[in-house]
């Protein structure tokens, strides 16, 4: 008995041979023989047949075939983004950024997320938005800084009373449990503030130091770290010192921050050139593409919602895509292949535009797939969800990956609550196994898409999520059932890793792609939609102001779109983030500042054109909010105040106005930074 075999490797190389089988035992008229084949590499296509011969004759089996592959490919995308926080009306670059989040997340997330992945045999994708990278450039090249950084740099002895109050009000903006309480001195300062005790000048200087130190990633707080640029970040010495800092210490700590800012793009570029990661992009200022193309295409299905005056500017959407491509090419030395549309928002028109602009793939949410086609796709079935689709296009088709919503949200919202990170990882892997792997049918390749925020989650994890991520990457790289891939790697193939190509023309088409995003607006009909950014009075007022500014720009401007301050201000105002916080479906506890910055960008359009800005831009879109909670009840509000009743659980509110009848209103779930339901509220 012998086995004749042939192996075709992923790179096309062939080898063949015949292996004699050894007799094992007889069982009545049957005999058992054993022939060892292999070893095989991932991606090998193996065919074989068995021949047996005896004095009585010969027997030949049919040819059998199999391919060596994992049970599941996993394409993982970490999305990193911040809106344009720079006030275009600021007279000086120093302090021109109204919020410090670009700088602070760079200390914890933007460099370290890529560096951490590089320590493991995993291939992942990082989405860096152009507007985020633009702001990092501002800090590094144009002398820009934020208000918090200016408060940090100012000697504690020279802080005015107003500056002291600003510092005490904002320098505890960190996760209490994971960023404040674990540091003894920072916790002392926090408790001192909660008691209302006076802060001495040394206390203020310690607070200047600790607010910043708490945002450095865990690895930087525990040891000196050499960066890919050759510089070394060393703030662990300050963590060890705990208190009694000098002003020179504070300035030295600030200098360490700029080392990390300088290393963000070089780290990603080096890892991408080494084939370890893929860097994707987003339309330039993070707009909701389908709404820029035509707001009238959005489904308005929340009770009380309505459409704003029509805003239909596909040319503006195209400009965001063009700028994203050119910005990417400048930074990374190649054209981008992949796109994460802002908020995963897509429509048939938007995807057609993405393909025409030269992108090879994009990703969105499973909820979009569920609403696509004539009757919807069964996105809950892994055989349906775990594959890329090809858009049906008259111009250039594009591959579309649909993320698994529940598995992605588990990492974003749930696993930070686990005290044991390894238990959290095992729970995730068990969910992948039972929800996906065990339910797959056939021998086709399957790819699970995971997409989530790559920065905001980690404040809710112990040690900035580092133990969780290390355990996750170790398990994914060591478990033969799984193989992590970048999106382009899955489509193009990678012979070195045994991954065969999955060309566009071989993908199943997705028919009648639905309009939607990765968010189902609270209070609307079931299913993902665009309602978070349109339909409520505040959102519609913003769209009206945006339309007026664009009309003025079209009338006055003569320069190339995107090449002058007026266009930059308009595109910044078209970003999704302002509309996210308008209305009652999401809340930041700082909506008024987002409102003011949105209007500042629109004023920047008129200022750049030499035009007077409308008086409406000096009036707040968001009414003055007054929030009632059980912890902080409110007994009196002003005539122009807007009352919001907020709780941590669902329910109904019973209320009466004056001597009127008793009425009830349901408490609606509202999201936070990452769209998970954080609390429940009703606005009266």
Cite the ranges covered by each PLM segment.
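Structured, charged N-terminal subsegments at the starts of enzyme catalytic cores
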Residues: 255-286, 295-296
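Short, solvent-exposed turn/loop segments enriched in Gly/Ser/Thr/Pro and often Arg
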Residues: 127-132, 283-286, 338-346, 488-491
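Extended, Lys/Arg-enriched charged tracts that mediate electrostatic binding to polyanionic substrates
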Residues: 239-261, 265, 355, 367-369, ...
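Glycan-association/targeting regions that enable binding to alpha-glucans and other polysaccharides
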Residues: 1-72, 607-684
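Short, surface-exposed basic-aromatic patches at helix termini and helix-loop junctions that form
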Residues: 273, 331-332, 348-363, 466-479
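CE4/NodB-like, metal-dependent polysaccharide N-deacetylase domain
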Residues: 307-341, 433-451
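Hydrophobic faces of well-ordered beta-strands that scaffold small-molecule active sites
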Residues: 74-76, 124-126, 279-282, 337, ...
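Active-site and substrate-binding clefts of carbohydrate-active enzymes
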Residues: 71-238, 378-624
């Amino acid at each position: 008995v012998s086995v004749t075999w042939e192996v075709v490797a992923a790179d096309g190389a062939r080898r063949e041979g015949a292996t004699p089988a050894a007799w094992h035992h007889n069982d009545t008229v049957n005999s058992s023989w054993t022939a060892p084949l292999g070893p095989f590499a991932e991606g090998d296509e193996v065919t074989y047949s068995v021949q047996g011969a005896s004095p009585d004759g010969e027997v030949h089996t049919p040819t059998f075939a199999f391919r060596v592959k994992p049970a599941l490919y996993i394409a993982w995308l970490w999305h990193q983004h911040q809106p344009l926080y720079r006030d275009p009306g600021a007279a000086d670059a120093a302090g021109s950024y109204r919020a410090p989040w670009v700088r602070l997340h760079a200390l914890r997330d933007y460099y370290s997320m890529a560096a951490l992945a590089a320590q493991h045999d995993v291939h992942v994708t990082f989405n860096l938005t152009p507007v985020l990278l633009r702001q990092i450039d501002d800090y590094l090249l144009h002398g820009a800084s934020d208000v918090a950084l200016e408060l940090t740099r100012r000697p504690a002895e020279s802080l005015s009373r107003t500056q002291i109050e600003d510092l005490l009000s904002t320098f505890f903006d960190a996760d209490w449990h994971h960023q404040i309480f674990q540091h003894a001195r920072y916790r002392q300062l926090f408790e001192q503030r909660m008691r209302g005790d006076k802060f001495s000048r040394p206390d203020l200087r310690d607070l200047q130091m600790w607010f910043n130190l708490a945002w450095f990633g865990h690895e930087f707080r525990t040891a000196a770290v050499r960066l890919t640029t050759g510089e070394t970040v060393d703030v662990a010495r300050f963590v060890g010192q705990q208190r009694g800092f000098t002003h020179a210490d504070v300035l030295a700590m600030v200098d360490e921050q700029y080392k990390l800012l300088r290393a963000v793009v070089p780290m990603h570029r080096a890892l991408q050139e080494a084939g370890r990661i893929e860097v994707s992009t987003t339309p330039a200022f993070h707009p909701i593409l389908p709404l820029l193309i035509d707001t009238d295409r959005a489904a308005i299905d929340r009770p009380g919602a309505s459409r704003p005056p029509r805003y239909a500017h596909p040319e503006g959407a195209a400009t965001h895509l063009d700028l994203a491509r050119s910005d990417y090419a400048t930074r990374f030395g190649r054209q981008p292949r992949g796109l994460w549309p802002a908020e995963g928002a897509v429509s048939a028109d938007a995807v057609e535009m993405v393909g025409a602009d030269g992108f090879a793939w994009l990703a969105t949410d499973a909820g979009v797939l569920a609403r696509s086609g004539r009757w919807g796709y069964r996105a809950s079935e892994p055989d349906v969800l775990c594959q890329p689709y090809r858009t049906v296009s008259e111009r250039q088709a594009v591959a579309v990956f649909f993320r698994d919503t529940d598995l992605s949200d588990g990492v974003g919202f749930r696993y930070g609550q686990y005290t044991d990170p390894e238990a959290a990882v095992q729970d995730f892997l068990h969910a992948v196994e039972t929800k996906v792997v065990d339910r797959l049918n056939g021998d086709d390749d399957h790819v699970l898409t995971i997409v989530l925020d790559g920065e905001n989650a980690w404040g809710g994890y112990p040690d900035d999520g580092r133990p969780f991520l290390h355990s996750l990457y170790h398990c994914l790289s060591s478990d033969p059932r799984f193989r992590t891939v970048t999106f382009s790697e899955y489509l193009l193939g990678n012979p070195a890793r045994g991954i065969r190509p999955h060309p566009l023309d071989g993908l199943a088409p997705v028919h009648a792609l639905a309009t939607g995003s990765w968010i189902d607006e609270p209070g609307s009909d079931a299913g993902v939609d665009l309602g978070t950014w349109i339909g409520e009075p505040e959102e519609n007022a913003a769209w009206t102001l945006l339309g007026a500014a664009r009309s003025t720009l079209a009338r006055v401007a003569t320069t190339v779109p995107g090449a002058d301050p007026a266009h930059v201000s308009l595109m910044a105002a078209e970003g999704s983030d302002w509309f996210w916080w308008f209305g009652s479906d999401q809340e930041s506890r700082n909506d008024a500042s987002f409102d003011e910055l949105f209007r500042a960008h629109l004023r920047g359009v008129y200022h750049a054109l030499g035009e007077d800005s409308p008086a409406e831009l000096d009036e707040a879109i968001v009414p003055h909010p007054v929030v009632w909670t059980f912890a902080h009840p409110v007994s009196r509000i002003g005539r122009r105040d807007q009352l919001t009743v907020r709780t941590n659980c669902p329910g109904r509110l019973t209320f009466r106005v004056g001597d009127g009848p008793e009425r009830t209103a349901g408490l609606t779930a509202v999201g936070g930074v990452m769209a998970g339901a954080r609390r429940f509220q009703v606005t009266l």
